[in-house]
């Protein structure tokens, strides 16, 4: 087995319990297995959500069945839409969860850091903790952060810190910052169309800005 799955998203029970208590986005309905990040980003997929929430032990079984040696775990969407205080807390707990999995199953799990990008100073501290203390491989960043792209000057300290740690930057798609993509649901805004467009925009902005 030498396959590495780096598109390995997860949720963990405590976070989903919290999402299920919320009455505003992001929120989770356990009865219908529906996660709503926004009006145009709704995941109603019981099978998929069940796998996102599965235990690390269950992941190991699935990995063995499919010949996957390692998963690089990354927190699925939601915490970046919380308040700064909540985002900091849940990013820390998510990264702790991944590190516990790395210790419990050596060589089977690695991690992309979850960072509370609404607070850059807190993100820098958390990135240090993940890269120095946990030996994560890098940071998974959304292609945009709701009102800004990763080439924005405010995120440069994070990119510089990541480079200092020789960490990988995984730019993950999300719905574009474009009103033309709203109002028609995930079919337009998400994976079928919007995701690919937004990653392309993010990459081209970084290239034109001189990030690369």
PLM feature spans:
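Helix-coil boundary/capping segments in enzymes
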Residues: 1-212
């Amino acid at each position: 087995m030498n396959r590495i799955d780096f598109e390995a998203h997860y949720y963990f029970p405590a976070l989903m319990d919290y999402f299920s208590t919320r009455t505003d986005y992001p929120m989770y309905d356990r009865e219908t297995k529906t996660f709503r990040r926004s009006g145009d980003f709704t995941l109603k997929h019981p099978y998929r959500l069940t796998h996102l929430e599965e235990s690390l032990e269950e992941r190991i079984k699935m990995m063995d069945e499919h010949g996957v040696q390692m998963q690089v775990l990354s927190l699925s969407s939601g915490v970046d839409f919380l308040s700064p205080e909540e985002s900091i807390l849940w990013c820390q707990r998510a990264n702790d969860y991944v590190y516990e999995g790395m210790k419990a199953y050596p060589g089977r799990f690695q991690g992309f850091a979850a960072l509370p990008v609404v607070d850059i100073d807190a993100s820098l501290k958390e990135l240090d903790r993940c890269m120095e203390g946990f030996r994560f491989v890098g940071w998974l960043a959304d292609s945009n952060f709701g009102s800004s792209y990763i080439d924005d000057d405010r995120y440069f300290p994070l990119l510089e810190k990541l480079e200092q740690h020789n960490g990988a930057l995984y730019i993950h798609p999300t719905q574009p910052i474009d009103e033309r993509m709203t109002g028609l649901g995930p079919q337009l805004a998400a994976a079928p169309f919007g995701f690919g467009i937004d990653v392309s925009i993010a990459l081209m902005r970084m290239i034109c800005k001189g990030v690369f």
